[in-house]
Amino acid sequence: MDNHIRLQTLDWDEYTKTARQAAADGIVLLRNEKSVLPLSEGSRVSLFGRAQLSYYKSGTGSGGMVNVAHVTGIREALENEKSIRMNRELLHLYDRFNDENPPRTGNGWGDDPWSQDEMPVTDAICREAAEESDIAIVLIGRTAGEDRDNRDEEGSWKLSGLELDLLRKVRGAFGRMAVLLNTGNIIDMSFLDEVSPDAVLYVWQGGMVGGLGVVDVLTGRVNPSGHLTDTIALSLEDYPSVKNFGTGDLDIYQEDIYVGYRYFESVARDRVRFPFGYGLSYTSFEIRSRKVETHEREAGSRLTIDLDIEVTNVGDTAGRSVVQVYARCPQGSLGKAARVLVDFMKTDLLEAGQSQLLSFRIPVRRFASYDDEGATGDVSCWVLEEGRYDLYVGENVRDAVCVTAESGAFSISNNWPIEQMEEALMPVRPFDRMVMKSSITEEEPDTPAYIDGPTAADIAAAASAIAAAGQEEQEDEVQHIDRDRFDRALYIDYEPVAVRSIDDYKRIFENLPAELPYALGKGLVLNDVREGRCTMDEFIAQLSDKELAQIVRGEGMGSPLVTPGTAAAFGGVSEDLREMGIPAVCCDDGPSGMRLDCGNHAFSLPNGTMLACTFDRELNRKLFSFLGLEMLKNRVDCLLGPGINIHRNPLNGRNFEYFSEDPFLTGEIASAQIQGLQEQGVSGVIKHFCANNRESRRRTMDSAVSERALREIYLKGFEIAVREGKARAVMTSYGLLNGIHTSSLYDLTTTVLREEWGFDGIVMTDWWSTLSPKDVTENGLTGEYEKPDEDRLFRDALNGKLYDFSSMVRAQNDLYMVVPDGKTISGDGADTLDALEEGRLTRAELQRSAANICRFAMETEAMRRLVGEGSTVTVENAPEDENLDSVEMVEYRKVPEQGLVLDLSQVSGEKGSDYLMGFELEAGAEYLFEFEGSCRAGELAQVPVTFFFTGIPLKTMIWNGTDGDIACHAVSFRTRKRNNIFRLHFGQNGVRMRDVKITKCRE
């Protein structure tokens, strides 16, 4: 064995324990009347709801396609819990209904039903159950995902009629009732007004051990400590984005920066059911400010606020609290939200009576606003406007108390420019955006002129009025004065958005890199750069035009160059590139675990929203460190995640992957996850950059967003992940941003990402992305052009017919993901070499992307393996049913037009064995697989052989005894990609395969 190989161990028990903790700590307890939870020892429980037999471990699409041996759902976990007794007769009733009414499965990708049809119940069923039980638990399930938004209809956003009827009847029969919401995102909560259950919990989608986390909370083994990452409004219509969230090709972000609580806490407090950051516990906490200090280093971003907060568990059971810190900033010329989250911290597990001191150091840059039109006198600049700044601390945005009442966190007399930027990404379409204004002005003598917070005189008057009261009452009264007197002065207005004034193409031309003279035949390899024997420039100068055109192409899905069944290979996609020591780097779908389409098992994690609801950076880091070890074991270098778009609207189908309506929380949780992966030498690819906040028509959707809203909301999470989390890989989105596809948007992937944030990694497109035509990127100021046929472009991309690579490379989006064959660059329609010849692309721009790719590849595990320094990971304590063996490499056999017959006579067919087959097929075509073989068992035998595509069973072929004769089983399948992996699983001994014939079906 090479002495440089690292030997590492992945303890499956510890991995499971950490995921289970996350699945418990992310649960949000919204209501617990009469303290019906936790369940007492010996509680008799009736479990209602069809969802008990259809637990959703994650949402749908690439973010949830993790192949697992077993999912422990809520019902199974409850049945195995020894401290409670389940109503078995009621469970059997649901079993019978499920057998007679099989779950709906949909027709494939983007077509899974949001929920299953509920079982009708009678009053008699509920009364009988109530006689046998102490409490009813009703389970409601929902899913959505990639290519599948939620809808404002029953069974999706709204409860169905049968679900409402179930809740009514259970409420009428039971004195104690809890509702569990197994959903990927928040749903309509109006049922609370009518049914009023005693306890309500969002249990989200907890991955493969999610049910265990739920039961830990229900029984009190874990005290709930999750907090909402979104505002739950009274109705869908209350969200300010709703009128511009739809199914067309244009989404106008008219609400601007006023997303989620930034809107509700400013002007619609009465439309909130549960505020951002809300979450109950089985105990109570007292939060007190012990120190607030301003460190005056110099004006601007280096100023910090030091804050010490003491948290005491004043209840009678151990628990954890989440302390949230919000800023209140002067309205100034720009207008601000009433509160903005600037930090948070979670306590340790505090026993009853125990205290913990939490120390915050908050850069005041987090208080700054972006001026995209020059209202402050500093255009394209982060600015602290003059006035008073206050801090509010609490367990949610609504209940946070001002801790700087006497003097303010700090005050400034003149505007402070914090960081000067360049105009970038501004809209090309004029529209009116929401602004915040105040009804209190200096001209109104009966009201204070300073409306952005209580003045010192206000505070003094309030303090005098309640001098005899206790400290807590004083804080409450001051808070009351602040809100009632000043916050209600804010109101909504609309003003024209600032539009683009620069020439994008001119900026590209003025910043072209210098070309490296071609240096043929030097014989340098990438490890020479790694070892310091040559520079990256010297190495890149060796690449020919052809090799430069190859290296900007990722190969997939299921490239034979890397782990079978993964999303793509990039870097060494041709023999010439590999001879130069450039490894083939493997990336795989995430973020809820690895998607291994070869059929091997992987760990399915809780969904992104649930992980963010923990408000726990360290837990997220630890969990993703385990995932990093699992990636090493499977030779996966990059996980395509985390997904960090903003919950702009509750109906976005992909909200389950994303974290929050708040960009700061999003960036902090993303940074923790990225750091966990990087501890193991692997990377996360943050996505989808940016404004991917809808799935309907996501390839053609143009998001019209102000530069201020982009920088403060939709880019902020990415910025934090890059600057603090040190993310080294970014994936652009499918759609357009202010008139240009993000895959070809120079100001996004170069001006902002690289030049302003200091990013030095790689940027890749989403899979089979559309690239904006050159006439759009060169003349995109109007935002008006004839859009191409997106469906045709997608079909062409699947089959390797490509367009407009020049616009992608010119934007410094380094990698097109994906092509069927990375080494072949002729005849596929990509314009890379033609653009070089015509002068629409320079060799220097290709060299720039090649250097980005090589710098990244040089630090991957793939590179370490190439030079004998890789890791060997051993899994300990894995269950016997987990297929965690290292994935074998698979040969892809091309199926010609006349078909292919593959000899299977050497396949053992031993019970429990698997056989992998790889085929190169035409994407989008339908194929017939005809298996021939014999069964040695008796004629009444029923020997199962299951045919899988990835982890999805296409058909279980039941073989009866054939007495040596040949029998045939046929399966049809429509492909979505070129390289496809199939698996035969032999459930019993006895079947001897002869061959399989694959033919393309006629359309």
Regions found by a protein language model. Give the residues of each.
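Glycoside hydrolase catalytic-domain context in secreted enzymes
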Residues: 1-399, 423-1003
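Short beta-strand elements
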Residues: 399-427
